[in-house]
UniProtKB/Swiss-Prot annotation:
The lineage of its organism: Bacteria, Pseudomonadati, Pseudomonadota, Betaproteobacteria, Neisseriales. GO terms for biological process: tetrahydrobiopterin biosynthetic process. This is Putative pterin-4-alpha-carbinolamine dehydratase. The keyword Protease does not apply. InterPro entries: PCD_sf, Pterin_deHydtase. Keywords: Lyase. It is an enzyme of class 4 (lyase). It comes from Chromobacterium violaceum (strain ATCC 12472 / DSM 30191 / JCM 1249 / CCUG 213 / NBRC 12614 / NCIMB 9131 / NCTC 9757 / MK).
Amino acid sequence: MNLLELSCTPQHGQSPLADNTVKQLLSTLPDWEIVGIELRKTYRFANYHETMAFVNALAWIANQEDHHPDMSVHYNRAVVNFSTHDAGGLTLNDFICAAKTEALFRRP
């Protein structure tokens, strides 16, 4: 499954993914980790301008997918957390958006 080719879908009333599915999907996302019921990664940048450019581009992706991360923004880093609150845990939407976040960060 190529997460980059998928789009988020409404998750109202859905259950979180099973642990084995979470582990399998997590293995496709370098340096992401599970913290509680969130999928998290810290991205590092050279300066505030690069950090904010990334955050703004990620905001555009989140708007397109209608799935929004919690973020903590600092001078040279951004901490990105995905979780599906309606499901009370992780859904495929979180992994789709994490993959798209990775692609954004790795884009030349």
